[in-house]
Amino acid sequence: MTFRKSFDCYDFYDRAKVGEKCTLDDWDLMRIPMKAMELKQKYGLDFKGEFIPTDKDMMEKLFKAGFEMLLECGIYCTDTHRIVKYTEDEIWDAINNAQKEFVLGTGRDAVNVRKRSVGDKAKPIVQGGPTGSPISEDVFMPVHMSYALEKEVDTIVNGVMTTVRGKAPVPKSPYEVLAAKTETRLIKNACAMAGRPGMGVOGPETSLSAQGNISADCAGGMTCTDSHEVSQLCELKIDLDAISVIAHYNGNSDIIMDEQMPIFGGYAGGIEETTIVNIATHINSLVMSNASWHLDGPVHIRWGSTNTRETLTIAGWACATISEFTDILSGNQYYPCAGPCTEMCLLEASAQSITDTASGREILSGVASAKGVVTDKTTGMEARMMGEVARATAGVEISEVNVILDKLVALYEKNYASAPAGKTFQECYDVKTVTPTEEYMQVYDGARKKLEDLGLVF
């Protein structure tokens, strides 16, 4: 039987009030892991150690497993403790009508985001920025300007303001509203000072409540040509605050960036199981959010990094499969263990850039150095490396990419527990001129030389 109309966030809200009751523990500890394990066994999924898949039959099985995961599990609403289910036709309607391209930014600084494919020769869009990392108020503009000054960077992804007018942006307070507005206003001023006033941005990142996120759409702040973030919860969950934000974004004709970071070793389980959930999450971004694009970010439960062997495999298989069987536009966000001005940080970011570029990602978003949790530990140099490596990787044979990645990850994977802390932006850059130190340039050249030795041609 055909569906009555295309599914939207208002339908989600209505079903979240009447769906099947379920406890949070039952969802997290039983339904998600059991279904993911069942589907892995049903489809015989085995990635055999490949970062980027070469077996299209296995990719098709993975897509079917991810689709089935979303269809049979649905999405858990954490506010009502009920499950929202979609019909198969509603899911296919969303997939078949995915937004195939869009423009970020304005004027000569605008960039066209278009579908890429596995092994594509075109370089992906580089969304450079702190990626939700905490940034001090006094260096908020210089930090973001360091990205806008890099020609490899196409758009900016915002950092989090630790204070606004010296006060913490407490959720649901006037200071959160002020911070949500100020965040993007300062970043756009930074872009203008770099000679790129039309650069698109992705946020807001500081605000945690619906009113904070919605207030970011304002004069001098977020506009409909910027990426507007809404986050799913791990795994296959959402709250009603986010549904309200989605309603605002759709009603404002905003570009919607639906974000979620599946956790390897968490509720979903192992590599194949987490990838199944990741596929379901990608598809849900269309059904629930009507998203323009989905921002991925598989993260390791122990190391808090997106650059481990396991998380790169999840990202590579998920993106390649989504690219092969849908028109969903996908990005990935970067959280290396090491901090700025270290070779390890640059090599970690490079491994993910290689994976994302080769697997068909449309947008690379980063870099949140030092796992994105240390104040002021992020700079434009890491984004430069992300972009240069993407350019060097585009069009390289997948078999060669897998060999390079295996050797590259081996260079740093034994050092997660003792990853170098690195330096703050203030220690890496001249804050007044917004230029990197001689020390950082030497570190950068050293990392680049190691990548060349592995076979990358810059």
From Swiss-Prot:
GO terms for biological process: methanogenesis; methylation. Disulfide bonds: none annotated. Pathway: One-carbon metabolism; methanogenesis from methylamine. It comes from the Archaea. InterPro entries: MtmB_MeTrfase, MtmB_sf. Its EC number is 2.1.1.248. GO terms for molecular function: monomethylamine methyltransferase activity. Keywords: Methanogenesis, Methyltransferase, Pyrrolysine, Transferase. It catalyses: Co(I)-[methylamine-specific corrinoid protein] + methylamine + H(+) = methyl-Co(III)-[methylamine-specific corrinoid protein] + NH4(+). Catalyzes the transfer of the methyl group from monomethylamine to the corrinoid cofactor of MtmC. Belongs to the monomethylamine methyltransferase family. This is Monomethylamine methyltransferase MtmB3. It comes from Methanosarcina barkeri (strain Fusaro / DSM 804). The gene is mtmB3.
